[in-house]
Design a protein with these regions (language model features):
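Phosphate/dinucleotide-binding and metal-coordinating scaffold of catalytic cores
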Residues: 1-295, 299-379
Length: 379
């Protein structure tokens, strides 16, 4: 496979700018003149709308700025691509990050696209969900799967660690997850129950469903918030994870909810609704024992009509631990056993009224106990 050294980054029908590999294997970026006149900053922190060549300072993302790394698949998608390349007698270790972005092309998460695009599979078949789940397990257990091309097309550019596919249901774009080998077989039912509880707790969520299965209690699915139907057809929405905004290694604990609340205020220009929703997510994660609350699990969406950023719907909410036994994002400095005191400190520190914080804490603690008791008892 011929290596790419330069890529064009596009948004809808406009060229945002150019990515180019430097001699020291970092990927420089420069906005196009057209975008400087009519566009917006694709990362207000790292890439202000200025005429200059930007070069990453940090090395978390293989020489990329975080906003472009957000377009790349995480563990599952990367595993699929690497297996697919090997099946086609190609060495995945020879790919640069620009090659991987070119393979993502127009199919990545968010609104940014990369050109020239490298194409792989041409069409997807219609295997049922149980069959796809079986093929995912074969790959995770290092067995060969004869559905590599189909699985890559369905889910190879999605983020996250768990196997998943991206598909269209009733003209809407959805993500459907399958259990990983470390999950229980009913992980989908658990994540669905968590999503229902989160909605009851006033947390903004995309539509979720539990898709039927003959082999487990169902597969969890969620409507994509980076895709929307409009009068002109499908619209892609530009998105930024917190990891990308702050150029953080999401696999390392490096964030506190104080910082997340402050970031939400800055990104949304003090939108009270978004700030309160972030507070609700923190409370939910504490009471529902979601400790995998890393910096890629908090995202902001650019609303072009408003020329403004907003907090995205919540996602990846489920019972989870970390290998070090603490929240990935600490709560007022406490990652192991945060409680009411720390939650109040974060809320009031962000300018919320203490009485309002107490109301939300009580509301969410009660709802979580009512709706998620079966998952929390004895754990």
């Amino acid at each position: 496979m011929k290596q790419d050294k330069v890529l064009q980054v596009c948004y809808e029908d406009q060229t945002v700018g150019t990515l180019a590999m430097t001699a020291d294997h970092k990927v420089a970026f420069q906005y196009s003149d057209e975008w400087l006149e009519t566009g917006f900053s694709i990362n207000p922190f790292s890439l202000p709308l200025q005429k200059q060549v930007f070069v990453p300072v940090k090395d978390h993302f293989e020489g990329l700025f975080g906003v472009f790394e957000d377009s790349l698949p995480d563990h599952w998608g990367r595993l699929l691509l690497d297996r697919l390349l090997r099946a086609h007698k190609q060495n995945p270790d020879e790919l640069t990050v620009l090659d991987r972005l070119a393979i993502v092309g127009t199919s990545g998460m968010g609104a940014l696209t990369y050109h020239p695009e490298k194409n792989f599979p041409e069409e997807q078949s219609s295997a049922d969900l149980d069959k796809l789940a079986e093929e995912c397990q074969k790959i995770l257990n290092t067995e060969y799967s004869d559905k590599l091309d189909e699985l890559y097309l369905l889910g190879g550019t999605s983020g996250g660690a768990r196997p998943k596919i991206m598909t269209t249901i009733d003209n809407e774009e959805w993500i459907i997850k399958f259990p990983a080998h470390v999950d229980g077989k009913d992980a989908g039912k658990m994540e669905y129950d968590y999503s229902c509880c989160a909605k009851a707790c006033g947390i903004m969520m995309s539509e979720t469903r539990l898709f039927p299965s003959e082999k487990c209690k169902g597969y969890f699915g969620t409507k994509r918030f980076d895709r929307r139907n409009c009068l002109k057809g499908k619209k892609k929405v530009h998105m930024l994870t917190t990891a990308a905004i702050l150029e953080l290694d999401f696999e390392q604990p490096s964030l506190d909810y104080h910082g997340l609340m402050k970031l939400t205020k800055i990104m949304t220009r003090n939108c009270d609704e978004d700030v309160e929703n972030m507070f609700r997510r923190m409370c939910f994660n504490v009471f529902a024992h979601n400790r995998d609350d890393h910096s890629k699990n908090f995202t902001y969406l650019y609303e072009a009509d408003e020329d403004k950023w907003h907090l995205s719907p919540a996602y990846d909410l489920t019972y989870s631990n970390t290998y070090y036994g603490e929240h990935t994002t600490s709560v007022d400095g406490n990652g192991r056993n945060p409680g009411r005191k720390e939650l109040l400190a974060v809320g009031t520190g962000a300018g919320m009224k203490k009485t309002r914080c107490e109301e939300i804490i009580d509301e969410i603690e009660k709802k979580v106990k009512e709706m998620l008791e079966e998952y929390l008892l004895g754990k």
